[in-house]
Amino acid sequence: MSHRIRLFVSAAFLIVVAFISSLAVLATQEAEVPLQLQPPVDEQLLLQLHAKGDQIYACKSESAQFNWTLKAPDAQLFDRKELLFGKHFAGPTWQANDGTRVTGKAAVSIASPDAESIPWLLVKVVSHEGNGMLARATTIQRLNTKGGKAPGSGCDSDHVNQEVRVPYSADYFFYGPK
């Protein structure tokens, strides 16, 4: 075999292996999503975004107990090309750069496979604003969380109402009617 043919066969083989590996990774990722977090069967995936930012906690006192309580997320949302798509903030609310906004309410929460990370969620959209990219979303999954958990200490009588920001990232999958 000539050098060019060997090079071509080797390159083609590597491309096929990479393609098969990427399919296996995609299948594995879908298989790892717990059944309780699956969207309704009459919905389809509309959009996938990656969030990078902070979970903001406030030190609160209830019945002489001190706990870090989630105040709000504060994150930027990026599309698959890593372009800034919008932001995620209190509500919880997701807002696209086109002005579309959805607010949701957690329906299901499951511990993250990473014990140091915030839970995975299935969120039901409760309100819409605008007619852009998020207008058709009715269900949102929060998966692949990294970080964001409330501190285990530091909330006491000396720190009541103090806020702390904990870095996190997550993938958000937006679903809507087929």
Regions found by a protein language model. Give the residues of each.
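Bacterial N-terminal signal peptides that target proteins for export
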Residues: 2-12
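Primary mode marks residue(s) on the alpha4-beta5-alpha5 output face of response regulator receiver
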Residues: 29-56, 63-178
